[in-house]
Amino acid sequence: MNVLSCSINTLKGLYDISGVEVGQHFYWQIGGFQVHGQVLITSWVVIAILLGSATIAVRNPQTIPTGGQNFFEYVLEFIRDVSKTQIGEEYGPWVPFIGTMFLFIFVSNWSGALLPWKIIQLPHGELAAPTNDINTTVALALLTSVAYFYAGLTKRGLGYFGKYIQPTPILLPINILEDFTKPLSLSFRLFGNILADELVVVVLVSLVPLVVPIPVMLLGLFTSGIQALIFATLAAAYIGESMEGHH
């Protein structure tokens, strides 16, 4: 009976944890709309970290970069390489967009593991990585969709819509459906991976609070970085595809 009682209490504790992470939110009323306040708070923190780091690193630019300037120039070169590989020679105007997506998602993902969000108490819910909320990932995916539609229409005009009947008009429904599945796959892939990683860490910490969670947290940091790279790479690939006019 003691074992059964202990198991029930453990399951109840895990249920309470998952309820806090998934089902409860801290809402704000803004202009008649109800928004997730904790997502705005953590998103502003991530944006402040990015802007503050960039400002400090490049406030005194040097011809031969060192320290923070060298790091940010390396990151910029990396983003340029990703953009050029996926988009082609006309990648230049899209580097800021791809870079913003990559850096925001990367820092958001890592903030879930590295920043002590849990010590900040809210009336409802808890603070967590912005990408832990489906609203954030859907918004990023929709921005990507708008970007590749804009890229295609800017480059090819109304001829862009001709892709829906290529290589045969029979594929029209499938080609239209593809444009709806792209943002769905982008948003749910990112959301699912980040949410699952945070829940696994919370569960392990509650059960075995000392050594076991550390390797999982390190693996989570690695996969979080990979997810940011995947999202940015796919966004660039979709933009390049819309500009080229073929799949």
From Swiss-Prot:
Sorted keywords for this record are:
ATP synthesis, CF(0), Chloroplast, Hydrogen ion transport, Ion transport, Membrane, Plastid, Thylakoid, Transmembrane, Transmembrane helix, Transport
Q: What is its main location?
A: plastid
InterPro entries for this protein: ATP_syn_F0_a_bact/chloroplast, ATP_synth_F0_asu, ATP_synth_F0_asu_AS, F0_ATP_A_sf
A GO-annotated cellular component: plasma membrane
One Pfam entry name: ATP-synt_A
Q: Which GO terms describe its molecular function?
A: proton-transporting ATP synthase activity, rotational mechanism
Membrane-traversing stretches: 38-58, 95-115, 134-154, 199-219, 220-240
Keyword check for Lyase, yes or no.
no
PROSITE patterns in UniProt: ATPASE_A
Q: Where does the record place it?
A: Plastid, Chloroplast thylakoid membrane
CDD domains linked: ATP-synt_Fo_a_6
The keyword Thylakoid belongs to this UniProt entry's keyword annotation: yes
- Top-level taxon of the source organism: Eukaryota
Q: How does it sit in the membrane?
A: Multi-pass membrane protein
What residue stretch is flagged as signal peptide? none
Membership in a protein family: Belongs to the ATPase A chain family.
Q: How does it assemble?
A: F-type ATPases have 2 components, CF(1) - the catalytic core - and CF(0) - the membrane proton channel. CF(1) has five subunits: alpha(3), beta(3), gamma(1), delta(1), epsilon(1). CF(0) has four main subunits: a, b, b' and c.
Job description of the protein? Key component of the proton channel; it plays a direct role in the translocation of protons across the membrane.
Q: Which HAMAP family match?
A: ATP_synth_a_bact
What is this protein's record name? Answer: ATP synthase subunit a, chloroplastic
Species name: Solanum lycopersicum (Tomato)
In the UniProt record, the gene name given for this protein reads atpI
